[in-house]
Amino acid sequence: MDTKRIATLALASLLWLGWFYTLSSTIATPPVTALRWIPPRSTAFMDRERGGAVSWDWVPYDRISQNLKRAVVEAEDGEFFEHQGVDVDAARRAALHNWRKRKFSRGASTITMQLARNLYLSPAKSPWRKVREVLIALKLERELSKDRILEIYLNVAEWGRGIYGAEAAARHYFRKDAKDLGARESAFLAAILPRPRFYDKHRSGPYLNRRISKIEGML
């Protein structure tokens, strides 16, 4: 990496961190301690369905296929068990990308950050939402174990219009329980997480099939 690129990356990182800490002191975050023991009653994403049918069945961590747990971590956040809610290197790369593009298009969201967004925020991309997302993610990491964070995430993630959580997804796509998902099925569910509503209607294609095979190969 040349000197100019390093300097640009460092400047982008400093600007992002300065902006983040300036805003963070003014932002309130929801209480999350109760999530240690009590599943959420709903999520911000479920609430936006506005009266539409929602399929959601909570299942405990030990009733979710190990294949799915591994597939989702590999696909969405390979450093999940190492970081404290924010992948600093990924965030730095995203900040540089956004600075170059002069728009907020990449967010480097970890599983914990995605959980914060699903529970309390909206899918709209904005710097303001990203700051709240990071702050809530840091709070979740302080209050909950990694297994609990992953358990909640797998139970509230969206897998299609009105399809929330691993159990509903397993039944919707494969007519089976989440605990019985195989490697290929788990890789499919992990692969469609970035665009679940689109892939619910388009369940095959060259890109998706390559992504499924890549994730399956990691298991």
Each model region followed by its residue ranges:
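Juxtamembrane regions of bacterial inner-membrane/periplasmic proteins
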Residues: 2-219
